A protein has these predicted regions:
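Conserved NB-ARC/NACHT P-loop NTPase core of NLR-like innate immune receptors
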Residues: 1-191
Length: 191
C-alpha cells in the first residue's frame, strides 16, 4: 500500500455564520468522526469514548475529545495523517476567558506538542495579529497569500469592470465612475 493510499485526511472549516463550526469542541468532534471512519481499530477508540459517556447520553468535554483524538493519532502503523483547518480567523475572538479563539489556538498548540512524526497540520487564516503570534512558534513552513498590493489591484479591476459594464451607470460621467471605483476599492480593505 502506498503512502497516498494509507494517508488519513480530515478537514474542518470554521464558519463565522455557523456557531456549530467555531470552537475546539466542534473541531475535535469533526476530526474524530472523520478519522474513525477509516478503520475498525480507530472506530473502536471512538466507541470507547461513547461508552465512557453513558452511551452518548452525556456529551464529552473538550478534554475527553482531545484525549480520544490523541489516542487515535498515537495508534502505531498509521500512515501520514493530514489535519486541515480552514479559516481559523472565523473562530470568534469573543469575550470569554479564554476566548473561543484562544482555546482553539491552545488546542492547536497541544496537537503540535504531541510531536507525532506522521501528523501534519495545515491551518489557513487571514493574518490576524493574535493568530500570527500564537502560531509563529509552532509552524515549520508558512505560505503567505496576503499580498495587499495584488489584492487591492484585483479588487480595483473587478469593481472597474462592474462599474463600466453596468447599464445603470452608462449615463454617469467618467470622473464619477472613477470616484466610485476609488472609494469602493478603499473601503473594501482587502476583502
Amino acid at each position: 500500500m502506498s503512502d497516498a493510499e494509507s494517508a488519513f485526511l480530515a478537514y474542518f472549516y470554521f464558519d463565522f455564520k455557523d456557531t456549530a463550526k467555531q470552537d475546539s469542541r466542534a473541531l475535535l468532534s469533526s476530526l474524530l468522526i472523520q478519522l474513525s471512519n477509516r478503520s475498525d481499530q480507530l472506530c473502536d477508540v471512538l466507541h470507547g469514548l461513547y461508552s465512557e459517556h453513558q452511551d452518548g447520553s452525556q456529551q464529552p468535554n473538550t478534554t475527553s475529545l482531545f484525549r480520544c483524538l490523541k489516542d487515535i493519532l498515537a495508534i502505531g502503523g498509521l500512515g501520514p495523517i493530514y489535519l486541515i483547518m480552514d479559516a481559523l480567523d472565523e473562530c470568534p475572538n469573543d469575550s470569554g476567558i479564554p476566548s473561543s479563539r484562544e482555546k482553539m489556538l491552545m488546542t492547536l498548540e497541544e496537537l503540535v506538542q504531541l510531536g507525532l512524526p506522521n501528523l501534519r497540520l495545515c491551518v489557513t487564516s487571514r493574518p490576524e495579529y493574535d493568530i500570527r503570534i500564537a502560531l509563529e512558534p509552532l509552524v515549520t513552513q508558512q505560505v503567505s497569500l496576503h499580498d495587499e498590493s495584488g489584492q487591492k489591484k484585483d479588487i480595483n479591476d473587478y469593481i472597474t469592470s462592474v462599474v463600466h459594464s453596468d447599464g445603470k451607470m452608462k449615463r454617469w460621467r467618467d470622473d464619477d465612475k472613477d470616484m466610485v471605483v476609488e472609494k469602493l476599492t478603499q473601503k473594501a480593505d482587502g476583502m
